[in-house]
Regions:
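Surface-exposed, low-complexity/disordered segments
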Residues: 99-100
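Short structural boundary motif marking the start of a folded domain
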Residues: 104-106
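Hydrophobic lipid-interacting interfaces of membrane-associated proteins
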Residues: 1-80, 87-95, 108-226
């Protein structure tokens, strides 16, 4: 498929000799992405990297999303640090490549502004409403992960999830996920109202509680545990 990217202004000003100390600015203004079917206006794209100090900060501002990564980390070791975290809770399924103990610590914040371009170009089954938020804190040295997400509407393969809140937290007995919403619409006529899911996993052991209640008459409610 033919495609092209054009920008009226391109600014690249970077210093450093590795991905872990690269600092500076990358800016694209009035960016246009063209395919045979459609032209997409991406507006501005600004990537600001400050990795010259112990506490690093990377900011991405675009018409699609704003993303910020802050903390004491190395981009080259963050993936291995996360695998180390997963190995602590799921040693049967996740193996580490080394005995080295990573100490990467980072906070990630994401705000969705316009997901439609990503939806049309890359993930046609997934749509996320504007102002959706993801806030994540990670500390490999103490095997800690906390994730909070909020979104008015998430659509996947025709199923709509409304007023979503997700919390993921590290516990001594595993990783716990709590999901709350006002509705999961499977179709125009079928919906689960006020669903709540609590899921805990630790290696081969897991348990969950799923319940919903439409709080209307006729009543549609249920509880599933396992």
């Amino acid at each position: 498929m033919f495609s092209s990217i054009t920008a009226s202004q391109i600014l690249i000003n970077l210093n450093g000799n590795s991905i872990d100390n690269l600092s500076g600015l990358i800016n694209f203004d009035n960016t246009i992405y063209k395919t045979i079917e459609k032209t997409y206006k991406l507006s501005s794209f600004n990537l600001d990297l400050d990795q010259s100090n112990l506490v690093k900060n990377i900011k991405l501002n675009s018409s699609i999303a704003n993303i910020e990564l802050t903390g004491k980390y190395n981009l080259s070791t963050l993936p291995d640090a996360f695998m180390q975290y997963l190995n602590e809770y799921f040693p049967t399924f996740v193996k580490t490549k080394t005995r080295y103990i990573y100490n990467d610590k980072a906070d990630l914040n994401v705000k969705i502004k316009n997901f439609s371009i990503v939806n049309e170009l890359f993930v046609k089954d997934l749509m996320v409403s504007p102002s959706s938020l993801v806030n994540c804190s990670f500390d490999a040295s103490i095997n800690y992960l906390n994730i909070k997400t909020t979104s008015d509407v998430i659509s996947y393969a025709g199923v709509k999830f409304k007023n979503n809140d997700i919390l993921v937290n590290s516990l001594t007995n595993g990783i716990k996920l709590i999901y709350n919403a006002t509705a999961i619409n499977l179709s125009d006529s079928l919906a689960f109202r006020n669903p709540t899911l609590v899921f805990t996993a630790n290696d081969k052991i897991s348990d969950f509680d799923l319940n919903w209640d439409n709080k209307l008459s006729p009543k549609n409610a249920g509880v599933i545990s396992g």
